[in-house]
């Protein structure tokens, strides 16, 4: 066992304009090469553009867009016996779901074909708000692949049954010995 003390998780401060934790997480996801002021500028400028287009509170639009892009499960790879690798879907906490949704939105915004990143992010947020766009499609792909869960449950239940059979055989052997 290590003798090091466990580090406490750093609490992320809310952003200065919208006073929202979700916004500060998004700014940190946009961040590249340590230039946080540029990341803030990109996000706030895209929110201003959204406000001009929709004439609504941009924070509400952004929260709805993140809600539409959040998957209910997460796919993870698992190694089984004999080197088999399979994907298993796992239910995740709300905090983790939001992080995944932000990753989907920002990565799909970077792949868009608009002129600059501000327009790309603005377009992806509006698309996610309207339940269209690459981020929502990625969420739907993950939710369609829930079938590996059932395969995993069958695999686990077969192993449990076989262990019970082995235990019964051992008990019979012990009874025969005495």
UniProtKB/Swiss-Prot annotation:
Domain of life: Eukaryota
Subcellular location field: Plastid
Region annotated Disordered, chain positions: 137-178
PROSITE patterns assigned: RIBOSOMAL_S7
HAMAP family: Ribosomal_uS7_B (MF_00480_B)
InterPro entries: Ribosomal_uS7 (IPR000235), Ribosomal_uS7_bac/org-type (IPR005717), Ribosomal_uS7_CS (IPR020606), Ribosomal_uS7_dom (IPR023798), Ribosomal_uS7_dom_sf (IPR036823)
Gene3D superfamilies (alphabetical): Ribosomal protein S7 domain
Name of the protein: Small ribosomal subunit protein uS7c
PANTHER family xrefs: RIBOSOMAL PROTEIN S7
Assembly: Part of the 30S ribosomal subunit.
Protein family (similarity comment): Belongs to the universal ribosomal protein uS7 family.
Keyword field contains Signal: no
Composition skew (Basic and acidic residues), residue ranges: 137-146
Keyword rRNA-binding in annotation: yes
GO biological process, one term: translation
Compositional bias per record (Basic residues), positions renumbered to this chain: 155-178
Pfam families, sorted: Ribosomal_S7
Coiled coil start-end: none
GO CC annotations, alphabetized: plastid; small ribosomal subunit
Function in brief: One of the primary rRNA binding proteins, it binds directly to 16S rRNA where it nucleates assembly of the head domain of the 30S subunit.
MF annotations from Gene Ontology: rRNA binding; structural constituent of ribosome
Key words, A-Z: Plastid, Ribonucleoprotein, Ribosomal protein, RNA-binding, rRNA-binding
